[in-house]
Amino acid sequence: MKKDIHPDYHSITVQLVDGTTYQTRSTYGSAGDTLQLDIDPSVHPAWTGGKSHMLDAGGQVARFNKRFGGLTLGKK
């Protein structure tokens, strides 16, 4: 087996939207880094019945609506 071809696998902290944290091992970042999630199963519409609103990260939804808001799909 070749040496030094695999990424470093180390412990990181994952922080959920509600502030809950847990330790896991990953190739993300470097040892001891914290991965902060924008969306997780506790707030994702697929697991909450679709009642939650997706967070608009950086105005992407507004930019999409501005760009494509006037389009119609064959209806007059």
UniProtKB/Swiss-Prot annotation:
Entry-linked InterPro entries: Ribosomal_bL28/bL31-like_sf, Ribosomal_bL31, Ribosomal_bL31_A, Ribosomal_bL31_sf
Family matches, as Gene3D superfamilies: Ribosomal protein L31
Coiled coil: none
GO terms (BP aspect): translation
GO cellular component: ribonucleoprotein complex; ribosome
Pfam families: Ribosomal_L31
MF-aspect GO terms: rRNA binding; structural constituent of ribosome
Keywords: Ribonucleoprotein, Ribosomal protein, RNA-binding, rRNA-binding
Family recorded in the similarity comment: Belongs to the bacterial ribosomal protein bL31 family. Type A subfamily.
Oligomeric form and interacting partners: Part of the 50S ribosomal subunit.
General function of this protein: Binds the 23S rRNA.
Name listed for the protein in its UniProt record: Large ribosomal subunit protein bL31
Name of the gene: rpmE
